[in-house]
Amino acid sequence: MTTHQKQLYVMLMKWIHYIWFQNVDIDLSKRWIDIVGNWVEKNGTLWTIAHIKMIRNVFTRFICGQPCKRVDMILGIDKDGFPKVLKPYKELTNSQAGRRYILTLLSISRCLPGTKKPDYSTITKPSAATEDILKELIAYIPIFMERYSIKPFGVIRWTQDDLHYSVKSGPLGPSTLTAQADMYKARHLLPAWKKMAMFVPIILEKLMDAIPEKSALKFTSLVLGKEEPVNKPGFVNVTRIREKELKDVTRRLSIVDDPEAKARVVAIFDYWSQSILRKLHLRLFELLETFKQDRTFTQDPYIPRRLGHKYHSLDLSAATDRFPLKLQKELIAKLISGPYAEGWEEVLVGTPFITPEGDSVVYNAGQPMGAYSSWATFAVAHHMVIDYAAFKEGLDPQSDFYILLGDDVVINHDGVADRYRNIMSSLGVDISPLKTHVSYTTYEFAKRWFHYGKEITGIQLAGFMHILESGLNMRSKKWVDKQMKKCTAKSGRA
């Protein structure tokens, strides 16, 4: 960390102190910035990020009343389970503002640059789900649907009118612009598409006759009924697909670099598969809206307190990669009649995915995030697992003892939480014991922390640092001055 970067952090913390933490000595922030700077210089950013994450985890376990005594890293912890490096800040834990301040300091790890190679083993490793739990849950699907008054969707009809503009990326380039190329390269998926939408082969054969494979793209005008993209003189024709770009690829994996050196794997599908999946995607999101415990649309983190029960903030490891596709397929089969579920499975995982390194990988347990319907299907199946645990505990399906957002879940019922852990373990989905928090007073949901019903989430430094650095970059490059000169010149006021 350079001297200039340290100065930026101090500048930012002075402002944050003025707005939120006027009663906290600014020297405490300066001390922490110096410590982090020394760690970066001596050990690098990746080590520093991992170290701060562990400190944060030990700290949150402390305020949960579930202190860590030992961790898999060289880290000083006192007899109370508090990180020794934070000793000067320990008194601040007696107030809500103090806890929030410490979490603010610990969010500095999200500002540090760093990347890691993605781990594909969670994708390729065969499922560890037991046959017994799969049979139990598959048999429970009709009961789950009855408890939540879920009616089958019936037949999902897809026609040419359901084609849409997409701003997403496809395996060959921008999705809509490369739809014509996808149409030829993904022909091996026609049997699967037919199981999901019987008229797809007829429609595509008609389109293939109208649009030659290597001609200028007429997809927007012939299929969508829209005007073709306008091209300025001197620019490359954006509607032309060059022969060298037409690789035999219909599935790719893209890596998104998230904060704290995380590598998130996102699957990229061809335009036609996405278009056919989109109708199921919309129906599943309508279904998710009916679950009072679901937070997809609100991200509302509040959960009613149940006396005598603890909050269980459960951290799932690679949930979507490991949660059995077989169970999700059976759920889809109960929602949609005919061979739709078989086609859905073939479209999602029947074709290998090409990684950025050029390797080919296959999903052997769960399913890829990135396709329409994939996330929503997992979310509904996740609700079903919790409801199965609740059913075993004799609870009503509309009880508000948990909140859920995809793979993020907080359960405020000890019996349900214990059963849930056992079920997920039997399904081959790991729950991190170190990152999971169990407390009568505190819980974490969607990266937000609550203590005695009050939010203590730290101020996220990364967003402010990005704005601050962007502003300084523009100023140093005199970008604003250049733009102002252009504007005044055009207006005749130069």
Per-range role (PLM):
Residues 2-6, 49, 96-98, 124, ...:
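Acidic, glycine-enriched catalytic cores built around paired aspartates
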Residues 290-293, 431-435, 457-458:
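Acidic/polar loop patches that form or flank catalytic/metal-binding clefts of enzymes
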Residues 264, 276-277, 321-324, 419-420, ...:
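Short helix/loop capping segments that flank catalytic or ligand/cofactor-binding pockets
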Residues 258-318, 374, 387:
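Active-site-proximal segment of RNA-dependent polymerases
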